[in-house]
């Protein structure tokens, strides 16, 4: 019981790139749209049996967004510079990206020792405490947006994050 029963870490990176352009049926100017997404998911878990009757487990999930330059990924097109793009992505990865979602759950389970006494060896009672925490970042598009107030003055606003937590005790 000196070492954890299980210690785990999993990571995955998912990078997608889409380029959309409307079919030019009318001879007008068509502007392509680019959709880039580079997510980095990390999962952690720990299970530790402190004693035969007392057990602890912890799991956490983190989703981060890796920053990269806007626009088309094409060497030499529209001022795209592969070296600066790589530098920006590597720096973002070194700082573990920008966390968008984080959540963890901790559980403590205790099995009461009624089986140690002859009169109560037929009773089984387990108590479990579970605590949960979730954090969601505001959308990147809403980091700094302007709102025109009743006087016609533009004011910069920032949307907040969402935090939720809960706890459950079961007998």
Describe the role of every protein-language-model region.
Residues 30, 106-126, 130-141, 156-160:
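Extended amphipathic alpha-helical scaffold segments
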Residues 44-48, 106-114, 171:
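Residues on the lipid-exposed face of transmembrane beta-strands in outer-membrane beta-barrel proteins
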């Amino acid at each position: 019981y000196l070492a954890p029963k299980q210690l785990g870490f999993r990571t995955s990176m998912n990078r997608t790139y889409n380029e959309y352009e409307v079919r030019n049926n009318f001879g007008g100017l068509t502007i392509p749209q680019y959709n880039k997404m580079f997510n980095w998911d990390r999962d952690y878990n720990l299970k530790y049996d402190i004693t035969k009757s007392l057990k602890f487990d912890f799991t956490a999930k983190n989703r981060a967004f890796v920053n990269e330059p806007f626009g088309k990924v094409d060497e030499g097109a529209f001022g795209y510079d592969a070296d600066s793009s790589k530098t920006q992505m590597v720096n973002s990865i070194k700082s573990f990206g920008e966390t968008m979602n984080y959540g963890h759950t901790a559980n403590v389970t205790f099995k009461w020792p009624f089986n140690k006494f002859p009169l109560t060896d037929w009773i089984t009672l387990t108590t479990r405490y579970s605590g949960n925490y979730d954090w969601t970042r505001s959308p990147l598009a809403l980091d700094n947006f302007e709102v025109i107030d009743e006087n016609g003055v533009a004011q910069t606003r920032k949307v907040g994050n969402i935090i939720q937590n809960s706890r459950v005790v079961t007998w």
